[in-house]
A protein has these predicted regions:
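C-terminal transcriptional activation/regulatory domains of eukaryotic transcription factors
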Residues: 1-20
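C-terminal effector modules of eukaryotic transcription factors
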Residues: 22-191
Length: 191
């Protein structure tokens, strides 16, 4: 886990300019391929724990570990996406992460003690009735003023990271629709 989080930090340092640089540096595309291979390896080691599949409360420690792992993977995708916007290069297709739960509720993520977290998680499980919100649902949000009940329910609990992901997913989906593409998410940025 520490290595994955370090990779997020190193990626930030690599992708974004120092104050004295005028623009984002160009990075060798092989770095992105290697980064994606790391993410694939991490995904193969598991991004969901059995308790989540069984819709029961995991241990606090296991939940922190898996939630942190998912956030680090999503952060790497977001970092690559932001670089791709700056350099007009294709971004990773994050649909392969659609099976993962969306970022955890703020109330669960910010609790710092196990004895506080356990009853909150139990209430959260009851609220979602074993059918938690998944990443893929971000791409299914229909454009318009109203959002579906599940998305609204998730938004009521979301933290800043989750809101960022949902906003970008919605933005990308809208551009995807406007471009008329029928394949995976394709970012086209007009500068």
């Amino acid at each position: 886990m520490a290595a994955l989080q370090a990779l997020v930090i190193y990626t930030i340092i690599l992708f974004f300019p120092k104050p004295e640089q005028a623009s984002v540096p160009t990075v060798d595309l092989s770095i992105f391929q290697n980064l994606q291979q790391v993410v694939y390896h991490v995904a193969q080691s598991g991004l969901i724990i059995q308790e989540e599949r069984d819709h029961v409360r995991p241990s606090w420690e296991a939940w922190i570990h898996i939630t942190s792992k998912r956030r680090a993977v999503l952060a790497l995708y977001l970092l690559h996406w932001s670089y791709s916007v700056a350099k007009c290069v294709p971004s990773f297709n994050c649909r392969e992460l659609g099976f993962m739960p969306a970022p955890a509720a703020k109330m669960l993520w910010q609790v710092s003690r196990k004895d506080e977290w356990e009853p909150l998680y139990d209430r959260w499980l009851i609220r979602w009735e074993g059918n938690e919100y998944l990443q893929q649902e971000f791409w299914e949000i229909e454009p318009g003023v109203m959002i579906d009940r599940r998305t609204q329910k998730w938004l009521e609990e979301a933290d800043e990271f989750g809101i960022l992901l949902m906003s970008l997913g919605n933005y990308v989906s809208l551009h995807h629709l406007q471009l008329g593409s029928s394949s995976g998410i394709v970012l086209t940025i007009h500068q």
